[in-house]
Amino acid sequence: MQAIPVSIFMRLLFSLTVLSLFFATSVKAEDSRTVETKFGPVTITGEPQRVVTLYEGALDASYAVGAKPLGAVITRGGDNVAGYLQDKAKGIALVGTSQENNLEAIIALQPDLILAANTLPEQQYRLLSRVAPTVASGVGMFEEEAWRKEAKLFATALGKLHLMEEALAELDERIAQVKALVETKTPEDQRTALLARWMPQGPVVLSKHLFTTSLLSEVGFAVEDGDVIKSGRPHSSPLSQEKLSLLDKDWLFMATINQDGKDALAAAERSPAYQRLQVVKNQQVVPVDGHVWSSASGVLAAGVILDDVEKALNAAP
């Protein structure tokens, strides 16, 4: 994140102060609630109507409980929100990426609530919180059930926790259904699985402690990550051709996020090293959408992932 020049910072600070005074005098006297965030407790009054999300998980949570955010960030490696949300997000304003938000675009939307990721810098938080209550997740990436905790956090901020609890209960029923299918379709000793994302430089292995891989574990797969991921990192460095054997599990879920990745994967699929993999010979490499499988999180993304797993199991030889 680039530093904000002092002149721009002061101009934004003045604008934000004026806006904060406006919102402070126009809020209705309604029930308030306090949520714990990365930067301390934040109090929210009423049911927000002008929500801006700066994190894909927050956008997913918003739609899962029926909220309609005005702004969102572009998905990783794309030019819009993730494909699985685009039908719901028609007309939404794009306010940057998860790495670099457009502060002026956010301010222009006059939000009454801003939802952000754990990675939001404190300087930006200070600016945004002058516009509207800003909820930055304090949940660590590798915490147990991190995505569920975040979903409940954002739903609480939206005043719709009861709807999120209902959505999670329905999802748990779906998880149980897919788990039963895994147990029916695959022998107990043939359930090892790995999630990789193919990049132009080669495949990266994703940690077994992330949103998607935790879902795979919940439905009965023995998820591995090849012991090639450094502590605190979500994925490995790109693997060389000589190390492709690390991908050779009973099931390989292979994600791509753009055309460059797809082209690189297509070239690799013709290589002897790739064709020697037993998982390839067994036809149990499952191509998946990297925007969902390696970037998204939340109830709606989980539904897409479970559908993909179900289709793969039913299509397996």
How should these model regions be labeled?
Residues Q2-F14:
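Bacterial N-terminal signal peptides that target proteins for export
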Residues Q110-L115, P133, L244, D248-L252:
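Proline-aspartate-enriched helix->loop->beta-strand connector
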Residues L16-T17, V27, L244:
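Cleavable N-terminal signal peptides
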Residues F23-A29:
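Sec/Tat signal peptide C-region and signal peptidase I cleavage site
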Residues E56-A105:
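A short, structured surface patch at a secondary-structure boundary
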Residues R50-L54, A58-S62, M164-D225:
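Basic- and aromatic-lined ligand-binding clefts that recognize polyanionic substrates
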Residues P41, Q123-P200, Q284, V292-P317:
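Extracytoplasmic substrate-binding proteins
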Residues D250-P317:
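Structured C-terminal subdomain patch of bacterial secreted/periplasmic proteins
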